[in-house]
Structure formats: C-alpha cells, structure tokens
Amino acid sequence: GMYNAAYLIELTDTRRFVLKVAPPDDFKVMRYEKNIMAAEVEVLRLLRARTEIPVPDVFAYDTSRRWLDNDYFIMSFVPGTAFNKLREHLSAEERRPIDIRTGEYLRQIHAIAHSNFGYFAQPNTHTSTWRAAFISMLEGILADGKDANIPLPIAYDEFLPRLERYLYVLDAVTQPRLVHWDLWDGNIFVDPQTKQITGILDCERALWGDPLMEANFGAFGSNPAVLTGYGVDLLASLSARTRRSLYNLYLWLIMTIECTYRQFETKDQENWARNKLDEELKILDGINYE
C-alpha cells in the first residue's frame, strides 16, 4: 500500500497471508491518517459481518509491540489482479459487469449507518453535523500544508472564508453513512479468468459521512456502469453537485499536500493536483444560485 507496508507470507502448506505493518511512530503523517491501521482492521471486520462484499479476513491485529516495533495485522491473501492493471486489457462487455458490481458493493457499504460524522478511527473528532465534520477535515489538511510550508493557489487563512458561502449545502446530509473513500480500480481485485471481483481492499481512509464523497461519483469523471449498479443518481441536484465540488477540493488538497509528506520522487502528482485545485475553485465560483 501507499501508507502501510504489505508483505506476502507463504507457508509450506501453500497457504498465503498478508502482513501489513504500520509506519514507525516518528513517521510524519497527515492529521487524517492518524490511527488508520485501526480503521482498516475494524472496517474489514464490519464489512465482513454486515455485507456480502469479498474482503480479506483479519486473523490477528497486534498493537502490543511485543513481536514488532510497529503495529501490524495479518489478513487473508486476496488472489487476482488489481483492476487498474486489467481494465485496458478487457472488452467493454467484460468491464461492465465488474463496474456494476462495484456500484452494488458501494450501495452495501453505504447501508451501514452511524450516529456521528467524521473519520472512522478518530472518534474523539466526531461531530453531530456533517458541516462541522467537513470543516474540521478541511482545517486538518490545511494545517498539514501549513506545517510543511506548501504553497497553495490562495493564502491558507483565506481558504475557508472563500468556501463559506457554499458550506450550507452540507446540511442536506443528516445521516452518517460508512464511506470507503478509496475504492479506485487499484483497490478492486479481479480474477483474470472468471472476471469476478475477488476482493475489495484498503479501507483505512473510511469515514462516516456523505456517500456522495466516494471518488467514484464524479471526482475522476463518471462511470455509468458503476451508477447503474449503485441504483441511485446522487448528483441529480445542483446542491449535490456543489457538495461534490467541495469534496473534490478536499481531495485535490490532499493529493497536493501528501506529495511532500510521502517524499515522492517526482512532482507529477503535485502538479496535476494543483491544476485540479485551480479548476475546482473556478467551478465553485461559477456555480449559480437562484
């Protein structure tokens, strides 16, 4: 993974497992990443208990530091190939059922509700309204950027005031729902022979929030087959499109700022995300209200 280190364990009886190890305590992480290994373990267990989604089985989760200097967990191995590596080699007829099934799985994830909003593994930051939770998330990523002296297209202290006039649209979200928030093709594993989904991975960034926040709903374009599987058009209203734009802004901020924290070798992602950030601010400013 991009955050936790993952190791394949092969036993002499041919069984395979995956060991995931958290970064060391002194590793500089962004605020929203605190405690995300606990989130991954708990969300995997929750999805296994409450949905029909194929997710790995968690066999051990250890925070004692007795065997390793870091937190770790052991889960079942998911066979198959990441869909992002497979997609271009499949026909449209082969891709469509996989995308439809992804939409169906998202619907199952979002059926799981909670009493408060916020990042799954940070209950001390949870709030009773989505607007308050989202403002807190924005404040967190802006503080991360400020800590690392990362320049943004507008001054840090002007960012939230710039968005203030749009934030009321978040009040339409009243029921906290489980949001995977990282269900891109790289986290969907598929059997190359049967074209069936063998596993959904990497739910450590899960949160209790607005289902529309899933990147599948318009962050990187829209996939009609995913929407067909999901069964509801979440982007039907102007208010929803404004919420989507706010969520995009948050995502582009993370993708800009995380490059410094991750120490990426190139500036490719950062440059791309900066352009998206500029575009999104213009989109928001261009939204007309009656």
Regions found by a protein language model. Give the residues of each.
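Extended, well-ordered alpha-helical scaffold segments
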Residues: 98, 151-163, 240, 268-280
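Membrane-proximal envelope and lipid/glycan-remodeling enzymes
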Residues: 17-19, 27-29, 195, 207, ...
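ATP-binding pocket architecture of kinase catalytic cores
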Residues: 1-150
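Active-site acidic catalytic loop and adjacent metal/ATP-binding pocket
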Residues: 3-9, 19, 58, 107-111, ...
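Short strand-connecting beta-turns/loops that link adjacent beta-strands
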Residues: 12-14, 66, 193-195, 249-252
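Active-site Asp-x-Gly
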Residues: 131, 143, 176-179, 184-245, ...
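ATP/Mg2+ or Mg2+-diphosphate-binding catalytic cores
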Residues: 255-290
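Preference for well-ordered, secondary-structure-rich cores of eukaryotic proteins
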Residues: 132-133, 144-147, 171, 255, ...
